A protein has these predicted regions:
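Buried, small/hydrophobic-residue-enriched core segments of structured protein domains
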Residues: 137, 167-173, 184-186
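Glycine-rich phosphate/pyrophosphate-binding loops
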Residues: 160-179
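Short, glycine-/Ser/Thr-/acidic-enriched flexible segments
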Residues: 65-66, 81, 136, 172
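Glycine-centered flexibility sites
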Residues: 63-64, 146, 150, 169
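N-terminal donor/sugar-recognition subdomains of glycan-related enzymes
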Residues: 1-59, 67-69, 176-206
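Short hydrophobic beta-strand segments
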Residues: 56-62, 166-167
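Pocket-edge structural micro-motifs
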Residues: 62-63, 133
């Protein structure tokens, strides 16, 4: 399968990054170009491989999820969530992660979308994954907008053609990894970005 870099919606990406850089100046946005270079060198697979799944009614599971839902494709946000689903006899079709929350869990999914950015690019390994970046992509890497793993998974579902998206476990007031100012600001941004996607396609929460 031929692989070329794609920015799915350049204007949306620019909007998202403008918000993120204003809200989270403490992050290493100045290293995102270097991260894109690393992503290009990792030999990832094409995002078109994900089109083998039926994206009509995806269910996106966030780390705090409790309830299962029926849908056409199972998307786990973070390796932690993929492992949590496995304990309930559900296998994730797609794991979306920047490998900072039980990274080994990404191997539990049928496929993975791994995000490479300025704060993690030196520790992202080579794998049979779709690599995403938050700058202009090169090589076999992609920009699907979004900023946190959670809202990026929702953008992915939308760009893959979802007619309706179900989200299980998105509770911005519940923090599992760490409870600090940066994490709370990220969750606030994720909430705003998911609402933006919900203006384009129905999004339900359980």
């Amino acid at each position: 399968m031929t692989c070329r870099p794609v920015v799915f919606e350049p204007l949306e990406w620019l909007y998202v990054m403008r918000l993120a850089t204003r809200l989270l100046p403490e992050l290493s946005f100045h290293r995102d170009e270097a991260a894109a270079g690393v992503a290009a060198s990792l030999g990832g697979i094409s995002i078109d491989s994900l089109r083998d799944f039926d994206w009509s009614n995806p269910v996106v599971y966030m780390p705090p999820f409790e309830r299962l839902a029926s849908g056409s494709v199972v998307v786990a946000v973070e390796g932690y969530t993929a492992r949590k689903l496995e304990r309930r006899n559900v296998r994730a079709d797609v794991v979306v992660s920047d490998l900072d929350f039980e990274p080994d869990g990404v191997w539990l999914g049928r496929s993975a979308v791994v995000h490479v950015h300025g704060d993690n690019y030196w520790r992202v390994p080579r794998g049979p994954w779709v690599y995403t970046v938050q700058s202009w992509p090169r090589g076999c890497a992609f920009n699907i907008s979004g900023f946190t793993d959670g809202d990026r998974a929702v953008y992915l579902a939308y760009y893959m053609g979802a007619k309706e998206i179900t989200i299980s476990g998105f509770y911005p007031n519940i923090v599992l990894k760490r409870n600090d100012v940066v994490k709370r600001k990220k969750l606030s941004l994720a909430s705003l970005l998911i609402k933006r996607v919900a203006l384009r396609v129905p999004v339900g929460f359980i």
